[in-house]
Amino acid sequence: MGEFKVDKFNIEDFFSGDLDIFNYSSGMPSILPDAVPCHSENLEINSYAVVVIYVLVTLLSLVGNSLVMLVILYNRSTCSVTDVYLLNLAIADLFFALTLPVWAASKVNGWTFGSTLCKIFSYVKEVTFYSSVLLLACISMDRYLAIVHATSTLIQKRHLVKFVCIAMWLLSVILALPILILRNPVKVNLSTLVCYEDVGNNTSRLRVVLRILPQTFGFLVPLLIMLFCYGFTLRTLFKAHMGQKHRAMRVIFAVVLVFLLCWLPYNLVLFTDTLMRTKLIKETCERRDDIDKALNATEILGFLHSCLNPIIYAFIGQKFRHGLLKIMATYGLVSKEFLAKEGRPSFVSSSSANTSTTL
């Protein structure tokens, strides 16, 4: 797609409001006030505070997810199906976090990195988001099959999980293609550029399509899969009094719960905004202002998710802590007496290695 040219752009097709009031945009702008000529009272968010948050999230994610990958790869001889999924999840979170410094820099001076980097960073962030939620759905199906429908052929999944992960990454690459094609630097006022979908005169229609795509395949469908699988998994665990396996599932449940707490608010607000843009909900200036503020706040909450999984593993995952301490003891960073005092975590006994996780 060529360079964005203001003289060929009908600004009334993109916005119907006063552009000078638009002082803040997210890294992936989704809230441009294009529905009614409203004057926001306070849409501006302290951009430097957002920069600090993004930098901290990036650092925590780099350290935490790198340690997760190290522990899993160090114990790859005993790596379970779930561990492979969690390894890919850590990779996705790591790459997601690597894009945050660029979005943080764009908070202060707008997008100054050109069209190519706009496409690349937007695409990487979109692919990693899709892959994260799809991998979580795969984990839920794996636990459902392992516990609710345990069979003698379950061990074969160890050889299939790599292909499942590759398929999820390829699906994420395909689902994110519209972002790669349409993202370009777009002017929102005389001096500020944002990295956003350049869809010309078809703004409203294509924007709704670009909203429905990630909301449906990147959140709603995986969410329904997770609710179904974990609902039946929990019922089976409680009915069979499988307390040991239930304790082993705590990390997985915590990972899914944190994902929902981080991304559900944003997706609910985004869904409400989509209904408003399609005129299914009456739009007023007050509602537009509330939606814009909510989208800004909940998007930041969603970005925090990329650094939280390693924290969950550290506090809940006994095997992760032991695995990390074992690596540190190998290189003399902690004493072997301290490692012995911590004790080796008991593994869940099973006819299949699929029901045990390193974390």
From Swiss-Prot:
It is a multi-pass membrane protein. This is C-X-C chemokine receptor type 2. The chain crosses the membrane at residues 48-74, 84-104, 120-141, 163-182, 208-230, 251-272, 294-314. It is found in: Cell membrane. It comes from Mus musculus. Pfam families: 7tm_1. GO terms for biological process: cellular defense response; chemotaxis; negative regulation of apoptotic process; neutrophil activation; neutrophil chemotaxis; phospholipase C-activating G protein-coupled receptor signaling pathway; positive regulation of cell population proliferation; receptor internalization. Disulfide bonds join C118-C195. It comes from the Eukaryota. Residues 1-47, 105-119, 183-207, 273-293 are extracellular. Glycans are attached at N23. Residues 75-83, 142-162, 231-250, 315-359 are cytoplasmic. Interacts with IL8. Interacts with GNAI2. Phosphorylated upon ligand binding; which is required for desensitization.
